[in-house]
Amino acid sequence: MRNFTKQYINGEWVDSASGETIDVINPATEEVMGKIAKGNEEDVNKAVDAADKVYLEFRHSSVEERRELLDKIVKEYQNRKNDLIEAITDELGAPLSVSENVHYQMGLNHFTAARDALDSFQFEEQRGDDLVVKEAIGVAGLVTPWNFPTNQTSLKLAAAFAAGSPVVLKPSEETPFAAIILAEIFDKVGVPKGVFNLVNGDGSGVGNPLSEHPKVRMMSFTGSGPTGSKIMEKAAKDFKKVSLELGGKSPYIVLDDVDVEEAANATTKKVVNNTGQVCTAGTRVLIPESIKEDYLTAVKEAFSKVKVGQPREEGTQVGPIISKKQFDQVQDYIDKGINEGAELFYGGPGKPEGLDKGYFARPTIFINVDNHMTIAQEEIFGPVMSVITYNNLDEAIEIANDTKYGLAGYVIGKDKDTLRHVARSIEAGTIEINEAGRKPDLPFGGYKESGLGREWGDYGIEEFLEVKSIAGYFK
């Protein structure tokens, strides 16, 4: 049992104002695995005051000092590798291999990328007699989701520290323990008091007062569109800057010159990775009519090899859905797919055989999907693929862009000119050609209803900065 019922404020572990707690459920067992503090407005006020008090000092710290701080964090993060992997496996239900190779590694990559970005980042620029200065925006409120407990927290924290902005972090109450370990890391390496503050709790008790606090100058949020909209509304009252990374319904365009088996394996991975609980999941798979039958044979074979199971069992690739609420939502979407006329090709409702305990869903493929069906337009956040056929490339691009989202897109094939044309044509913030993978120094963010702003590397640092021009500085 993990019991962490204190908040981390101004460099100390302190009692939460309410004295109340929240149970954290292990999704693989459906049992309580720990408790965290249920914070409230009083906790938020203390945390924001601590951050505001240190703001000017941290803003004026040198680039070298902040780089050294990030370097210390990188080293201690590596020292806590096993603790982070264990926490993520327990709270998220991620298989041990996924906790290590995806979650732990992505967090490390972001701290490293922010540290390295400081080697060349230009905080000042001379333009003739004038000076352009980039300086920390002020106290930043960070609200992070449950599906990537280290990735989403690390990329925001690393950028804020690099920029010189103190923060108040509210991690998801469903996966809070990785963030608590990060707090322990920061405490050990000597992050200055007030620069990092952790307030656990729920959205109404912590997220809302954080978004509305007059001393908070920026809100950075990753999560659902409706919640992002509410944060924008609250932040708009005093014109806070807002950075949002929201949902997606990403297209995966398969070209007609592709190696079919390779395409089947690649598209399968993009759907089942992290149990489909990925905002960039390529769940709309667009297949040329000419290779449809060969692809369906290959993708069914690929899905049949995916092992769903308990996170600590050897060979498990896909763990449980995060919660009963989310599991029920995935089941509802599968039912909608059937009821709206899509053909169930693989998987379907219910749990995999032998997995009655835990929120395990069956990896599922729908075929003959119309792009206007619910399962093709709404983010499911589960391992559900929608296969849509197309007759020509223009039609594929039109289908790909016929969505309110624009977070990611994928294309796989052989002809380089066609691959590049498709990549440029998809209306999304990040595109992968032939499973190239996203490096942590590339910008990450979405078009349309997938968000505002960009994160990762130097682009992430920019989000936490204000720009000042000083005319006549060099006269």
Curated annotation (Swiss-Prot):
GO terms for molecular function: aldehyde dehydrogenase (NAD+) activity. Its EC number is 1.2.1.3. Keywords: NAD, Oxidoreductase. Pfam families: Aldedh. It is an enzyme of class 1 (oxidoreductase). InterPro entries: Ald_DH/histidinol_DH (IPR016161), Ald_DH_C (IPR016163), Ald_DH_CS_CYS (IPR016160), Ald_DH_CS_GLU (IPR029510), Ald_DH_N (IPR016162), Aldehyde_DH_dom (IPR015590). The active site is at E245, C279. It comes from the Bacteria. Gene3D superfamilies: Aldehyde Dehydrogenase, Chain A, domain 1 (3.40.605.10), Aldehyde Dehydrogenase, Chain A, domain 2 (3.40.309.10). NAD(+) binds at G201, D202, G203, S204, G205, V206, G207. It catalyses: an aldehyde + NAD(+) + H2O = a carboxylate + NADH + 2 H(+). Belongs to the aldehyde dehydrogenase family. This is Putative aldehyde dehydrogenase SERP1729.
